[in-house]
C-alpha cells in the first residue's frame, strides 16, 4: 500500500491517503507497514480515515479469521521445526531431496556420448563460480552448516581415490574481475574432462560486490551469462578439452555458443540441498536423466517473447538474420537411452471426452524415464488459437526393449476456447493430436499449423480428430433469500448463480446500486449443474435501485 505514494505509483501524497485508497478498494491486508504506521493510526482516531470503509474491511477480515478458528488456534507462534516434525532433516528426507533433484535435471547436449563419465578418469577439472557454491533459490529459509552440498563435493564423493579433482572458481557470478580465468584455463589444460558450473546467484547474503542475478527485484536485460562467466566458458573451451556445462539457473540463458563449444550440457536449475550429489549421479551414470524443459530456450534475446504455444500471426514466421525456431524447445530433454513412439489411437466418446493412446518403446541399451507429452492443435476455430497446447503428460520408466502403452483422456474443457464474447465453448471441427517426448516441430515459414507435428517416431506420433460435439456454459441469476442483520443497519442479499449449460466456466457477479458498482466483485467457477450462493450486504434503509449482473445478464431487485 505504501507503493501508492511517491515511492512507486504517485496516486497518493502520503500514507494516510494511500490507506484511504486501499480501504476504499476493500484491501484488508497489507504487505508492508502502512496500516501499522503511527500517523495512519492517529489519522483514524482523528477521523481522517473513512470509518465505513475501515469497518467493511475489518468485518471481512474478522469473519475469515473466525471461520478458520485463528483465535482458538493461533498459528503465529514461533516455529520449532524439531517439535513440528523431528525428522525434517533425516536421511530419508535428504534422499527425497536428492531424488527430486535427480528427476528435474535436463540434459540438453551429449555429443559423442561423452556422458556418463567414468569414475576412474585420471583428472577432472571442476570450474566456475557455481561449482562449490550451490544456489538454493530465492526466499530459502536459513540453512544449517553443511546442509547445501555443491557439485564439487558431489563429484569428489562419487569418484575413486585414483581420480584427481582440480578446482578453480575462475570468476565470481557478476563482477567484471577476470584475473583468475588463467588459473581455470591451466586447470582445464591439465585435465581429461572439464565440468563447468555457471549460471545464477540466488544467495541473498551475496557480498564483495557480487549481486543476485535472480529472484524478486533482480532482472537482467540480456540472456548472456552474467559477469565474466561467458568469457570464462570460451577461454576454457579454447583449450580443446571436452567440456560439460552445468547450468545452475532458474531461467533460460543464451546457450547458442555453448551448444557449439561444449560436448555436453546439463541444466540442474536451483536444485535444493542435495543438488550436488544429484548432479554427480547424472554425470557418472548412476541416474539416467529424464527431466524435460518447462520453458523455451531461445537462440537470442531478440526472439523474446518466445513460447511453444504462441498464437498464429498475420505475417511469416522467420527472421532475416537467424532461424525462427528456438535453440531448445519446451518439453525437450535427452536421455542415455532412446525411445520410439507408435500405434497412436484417438477415439471420441459419446460424452464428448477423447481417449488418446500410444505405445512407447525403449530402443536403447539402458533403462530410463520417458516423459510422454500430449499436445493438440485446433486447426480451424471461430477465433485465433494457439499453434499447439500441452494437455497432459506422464512419466514412465522402461527397461531396454520394454514397451508400455500410455493413455490420456481429454475432457471437453481441455479442448475448449474463449469465443469473441469471452464465453468458454467447445466447437466442432478438426484437431491435430500429438504424443511425443518433446513439444512438436513447427518448421514452416507460413501455414504454421499445417507444419506442426513430429518428423519421425523417435520424437512422437501425430494423428487427426474430427470432433463432433459442441458444448457451452450458461448462467442464471436469482435471489435466494434476504437476511436482516440484527447487530447493524445492514441486510444480506443471497444471490444464486447456476450453470445451466454443458461446460464448466468462470464468471463474476457484481452489484450495482443506483447504477454504480458497489461492494466486492465475486468470482466463481461452476461445473454444469453446479450452483453457488453469494452474499452481498446492503443498508436496510436503501431506497435506490439495485441490480446484479453476470455474463451479459442483469437481475434487478
Regions found by a protein language model. Give the residues of each.
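Electropositive, surface-exposed helix/loop patches at the edges of structured domains
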Residues: 31, 35-39, 67-77, 284-288
Amino acid at each position: 500500500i505504501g507503493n501508492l505514494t511517491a515511492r512507486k505509483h504517485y496516486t497518493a501524497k502520503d500514507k494516510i491517503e494511500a490507506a484511504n485508497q486501499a480501504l476504499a478498494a476493500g484491501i484488508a491486508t497489507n504487505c508492508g507497514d502502512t496500516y501499522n504506521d503511527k500517523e495512519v493510526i492517529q489519522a483514524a482516531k482523528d477521523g481522517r480515515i473513512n470509518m465505513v470503509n475501515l469497518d467493511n474491511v475489518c468485518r471481512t477480515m474478522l469473519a475469515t479469521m473466525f471461520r478458520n478458528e485463528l483465535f482458538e488456534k493461533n498459528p503465529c507462534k514461533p516455529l520449532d521445526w524439531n517439535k513440528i516434525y523431528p525428522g525434517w532433516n533425516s536421511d530419508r528426507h535428504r534422499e527425497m531431496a536428492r531424488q527430486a533433484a535427480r528427476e528435474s535435471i535436463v540434459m540438453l547436449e551429449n555429443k559423442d556420448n561423452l556422458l556418463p563419465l567414468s569414475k576412474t578418469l585420471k583428472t577432472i577439472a571442476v570450474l566456475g563460480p557455481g561449482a562449490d557454491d550451490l544456489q538454493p533459490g530465492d526466499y530459502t529459509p536459513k540453512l544449517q552448516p553443511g546442509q547445501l552440498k555443491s557439485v564439487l563435493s558431489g563429484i569428489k564423493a562419487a569418484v575413486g581415490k585414483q581420480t584427481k579433482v582440480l578446482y578453480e572458481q575462475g570468476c565470481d557470478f557478476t563482477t567484471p574481475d577476470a584475473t583468475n580465468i588463467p588459473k581455470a584455463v591451466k586447470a582445464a589444460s591439465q585435465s581429461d574432462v572439464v565440468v563447468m558450473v555457471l549460471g545464477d546467484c540466488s544467495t541473498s547474503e551475496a557480498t564483495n560486490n557480487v549481486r543476485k542475478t535472480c529472484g524478486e527485484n533482480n532482472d537482467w536485460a540480456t540472456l548472456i551469462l552474467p559477469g565474466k562467466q561467458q568469457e570464462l566458458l570460451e577461454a576454457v573451451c579454447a583449450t580443446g578439452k571436452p567440456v560439460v556445462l552445468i547450468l545452475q539457473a532458474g531461467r533460460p540463458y543464451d546457450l547458442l555458443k555453448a551448444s557449439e563449444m561444449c560436448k555436453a550440457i546439463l541444466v540442474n536449475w536451483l536444485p535444493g540441498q542435495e543438488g550436488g550429489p544429484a548432479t554427480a549421479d547424472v554425470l557418472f551414470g548412476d541416474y539416467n536423466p529424464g527431466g524435460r524443459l518447462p520453458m523455451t530456450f531461445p537462440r537470442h534475446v531478440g526472439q523474446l517473447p518466445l513460447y511453444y504455444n504462441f498464437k498464429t500471426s498475420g505475417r511469416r514466421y522467420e527472421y532475416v538474420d537467424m532461424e525462427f525456431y528456438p535453440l531448445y524447445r519446451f518439453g525437450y530433454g535427452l536421455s542415455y537411452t532412446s525411445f520410439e513412439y507408435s500405434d497412436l489411437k484417438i477415439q471420441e466418446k459419446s460424452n464428448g471426452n477423447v481417449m488418446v493412446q500410444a505405445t512407447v518403446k525403449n530402443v536403447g541399451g539402458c533403462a530410463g524415464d520417458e516423459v510422454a507429452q500430449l499436445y493438440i492443435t485446433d486447426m480451424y476455430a471461430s477465433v485465433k488459437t494457439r499453434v499447439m497446447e500441452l494437455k497432459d503428460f506422464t512419466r514412465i520408466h522402461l527397461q531396454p526393449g520394454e514397451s508400455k502403452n500410455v493413455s490420456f483422456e481429454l475432457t471437453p474443457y481441455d479442448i475448449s476456447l474463449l469465443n469473441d464474447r469471452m464465453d468458454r465453448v467447445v466447437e466442432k471441427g478438426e484437431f491435430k493430436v500429438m504424443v511425443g517426448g518433446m513439444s512438436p516441430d513447427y518448421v514452416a515459414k507460413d501455414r504454421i499449423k499445417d507444419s506442426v507435428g513430429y518428423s519421425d517416431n523417435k520424437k512422437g506420433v501425430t494423428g487427426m480428430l474430427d470432433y463432433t460435439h459442441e458444448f457451452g456454459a450458461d448462467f442464471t441469476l436469482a435471489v435466494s433469500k434476504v437476511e436482516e442483520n440484527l447487530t447493524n443497519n445492514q441486510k444480506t442479499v443471497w444471490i444464486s448463480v447456476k450453470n445451466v449449460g454443458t461446460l464448466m466456466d468462470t464468471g463474476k457477479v457484481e452489484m450495482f446500486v443506483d447504477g454504480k458498482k458497489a461492494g466486492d466483485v465475486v468470482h466463481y467457477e461452476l461445473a454444469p449443474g453446479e450452483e453457488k450462493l453469494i452474499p452481498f450486504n446492503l443498508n436496510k434503509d436503501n431506497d435506490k435501485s439495485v441490480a446484479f449482473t453476470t455474463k451479459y445478464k442483469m437481475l434487478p431487485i
